[in-house]
Amino acid sequence: MHVLVTGDTLSGSWVYTRELVTGLVTRGVRVTLVSFGDIPLPAQTSWMDHLHGLDYRPTAFRLEWMHEAEEDRREASVFLMSLADELRPDVLHFHQFSYGNLPVDIPRVVMAYGDLLTWREAVPEDHPRSIHAIERRAHTQYRDTVLRGIATADAVVAPSAWMLNRISAAYTRPTRAEVIYPGRNPIFFNPYVSKDDCVLAVGRLVDASRQLSLLTQHVHPLPVCIVGSEQTIAMPLNPIRADVKVATDETSLAICGPQTEAQLRTLYSRAAIYAATARYEPLGMPVLEAAFSRCAIIANDIPGYREMWGDAALYFRTNDASSLAASIRLLNDDRSMRRAYAELAYARARERFTTKRMIDEYLHLYRNLIAVRTAAA
């Protein structure tokens, strides 16, 4: 089997794409990977070095949600059609909506892991109510582009039933819809290290959908480390330190710069608690990584987290900093409860969110789509 996969190098979905591609290749699938966005840095592609059976084609085409993306989208469509004609893959797997309507006689899978309309629905205060006419036209054009891709794809895959329902409500119900939960390879994470009394969170403070600022609104009884932040917010109520160490001798909030994957895995392994504060989290890869590292999960009470983690996480009242602080205090005071939640998260990740399970489900979908296309020929 030969699968042509597209991905983007600018978001956290690149980790998902890597898991998908690596998992397919190790199962004997030939993969051609086309990346959009920026040409990746060497650190972003080092995982490909010993992956035999992968043909990588980097491009700098804009992503469909970017300003002035329409011209790039047309050029990228021509490029993909030419590549499909040259390589004749068995399946096209797109991580962009717009190429779901590519006019080729090959099964097209679209992965719906996030979009502008459902993001704006979840984070309404992060964009102005009054939109300039040019922006309204761009918004309408974006919606129409995404709708066409969803409506004409042979299958649309979402990482959760919640995401699938939101996409269907915002655009249209796909002809064929599948929920395939994301996966990570547990071999990359260490769940056996002695834990430090600390809280870890991953994301940018300026990203309203991550709302990591909730962690700055109260003083906590143990250190908190936010990784990947590019700048602090104005006047946090909790004193901020700027280093990369998780545990400290004094209670504080540490703002860490971007970390390498090895550094981040070490932080996961040492952190006792992971704070999943997002109000919009369609993919949720950082939470998977924390769970595979046996962190206790404190999660914002949103439908996506409830679906993914069930009783394996401790939830705080939706978007409420005081409730988050109370949950942190609870797990700090009750070590047995903290260990129990860590075990629950680890067990749920091992049971439901491995790369192997994800690849099994994708291969089943691919084979079914190929069979349907062959029978119709």
Identify the residue ranges that each predicted region occupies:
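Acceptor-binding helix/loop patch of EC 2.4 sugar-transfer enzymes
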Residues: 110-147
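Nucleotide-activated donor-binding/catalytic signature segment of Leloir-type glycosyltransferases, i.e.
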Residues: 237-262
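Short hydrophobic beta-strand element within catalytic cores of glycosyltransferases
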Residues: 296-299
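Short alpha-helical donor nucleotide-sugar binding micro-motif in glycosyltransferases
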Residues: 266-271
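Aromatic "clamp/platform" in nucleotide-sugar-dependent glycosyltransferases that forms part
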Residues: 279
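Conserved acidic donor-binding segment of nucleotide-sugar-dependent glycosyltransferases
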Residues: 313-321, 330-336
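Helix-loop-beta element that forms the nucleotide-linked donor phosphate-binding surface
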Residues: 151-152, 158, 164-184, 192
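Conserved donor-binding/catalytic core segment of Leloir-type glycosyltransferases
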Residues: 193-227
